């Protein structure tokens, strides 16, 4: 039963327990719906229950983001287990030990398929909310004052980017597809030669180069990384190059132009796309705008395995310059 119908059917419900078993990017797609849900039920407490383990479906770092989401009163963690085939059959039984008996327990589900126009639309429909005409970007929540670690990286980035064409931020690894781009160093060095300052959360770049800054994820949380980028955006031309992972959604939330490297054929990719993303692909998707797709010829990539391809760094730089170069 949908939440709205359940609340109507049982006025004794005192709160809502939302159960999350997803990755960081997946969470970002939920944020417009969560904000709208809270607007509809402002007096109802929202508790979050998050899987405590890293697996192919889940990241406990989602809990850290929910702790900074003002719409949630409490965040709990549970020991879950993924289903080997069907992600919706995730075992979240352990969550119920901390759910008050007068709370409505709701797993955060969405449909993902060729027939689905967008994941955000699916989430609105799942929770009986009117689907917006235009898909809203993810909502991010930052403190009024940057954390000391954010200020430290901000100082480094400001000094490095001074006088450059802009900053290019790289995220070229994906937990969901178990992939890391193998040409990080060459790509970063090529962008630096083109006059850009390069930042990355993916390891493998030219650490000794003064025009390169790798984010230490042990020092800077994912939300702090986004906060850092939001501050840099106000001072520098800022771009993203990312494989289909967290920073597709994050770049949309931050309003940053993104050269999105679609590293495997996924006919459901329109579920995850935002208009700020120029999609590099070796397969033209009929459900994505054609003008937002950059076709990659066979000579522009090599095979990583039977499913995944690696785009050659010189081609990535060529496409980047064509779309965003000055």
Stretches found by the model and what they are:
Residues 49-102, 106:
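Active-site donor-binding segments of glycosyltransferases and PAPS-dependent sulfotransferases
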Residues 65-68, 252-326:
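Nucleotide-sugar donor-binding patch of glycosyltransferase catalytic domains
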Residues 71-75, 102-103, 117, 126, ...:
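Active-site regions of enzymes building and remodeling cell-envelope glycoconjugates
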């Amino acid at each position: 039963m949908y939440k709205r119908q359940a609340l109507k059917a049982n006025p004794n419900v005192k709160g809502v327990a939302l159960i999350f078993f997803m990755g960081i990017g997946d969470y970002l797609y939920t944020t417009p719906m969560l904000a709208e849900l809270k607007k509809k039920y402002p007096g109802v407490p929202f508790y979050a229950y998050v899987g405590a383990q890293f697996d192919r479906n889940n990241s406990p770092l989602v809990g850290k983001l929910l702790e900074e989401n003002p719409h949630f009163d409490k965040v709990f963690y549970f020991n879950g287990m993924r289903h080997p085939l069907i992600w919706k059959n995730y075992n979240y039984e352990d969550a119920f030990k901390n759910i008050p008996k007068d709370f409505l327990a709701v797993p955060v589900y969405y449909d993902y398929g060729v027939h689905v126009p967008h994941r955000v639309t699916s989430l609105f429909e799942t929770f009986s909310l009117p689907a917006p005409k235009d898909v809203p970007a993810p909502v991010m929540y930052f403190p009024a004052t940057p954390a000391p670690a954010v200020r430290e990286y901000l100082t480094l980035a400001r000094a490095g980017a001074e006088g450059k064409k802009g900053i290019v931020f790289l995220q070229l690894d994906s937990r969901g597809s178990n992939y890391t781009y193998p040409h990080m160093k060459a790509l970063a060095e090529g962008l630096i030669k083109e006059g850009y300052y390069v930042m990355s959360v993916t390891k493998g770049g030219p650490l000794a180069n003064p025009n390169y800054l790798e984010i230490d994820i042990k020092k800077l949380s994912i939300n702090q990384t986004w906060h850092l980028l939001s501050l840099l955006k106000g001072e520098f031309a800022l771009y993203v190059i990312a494989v289909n992972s967290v920073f597709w959604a994050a770049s949309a939330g931050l309003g940053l132009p993104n050269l999105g490297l679609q590293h495997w054929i996924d006919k459901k990719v329109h579920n995850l796309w935002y208009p700020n993303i120029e999609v590099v692909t070796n397969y033209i998707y009929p459900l994505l705008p054609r003008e937002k797709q950059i076709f990659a010829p066979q000579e522009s990539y090599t095979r990583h395995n039977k499913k995944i391809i690696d785009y050659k760094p010189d081609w990535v730089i060529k496409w980047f310059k064509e779309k965003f170069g000055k």
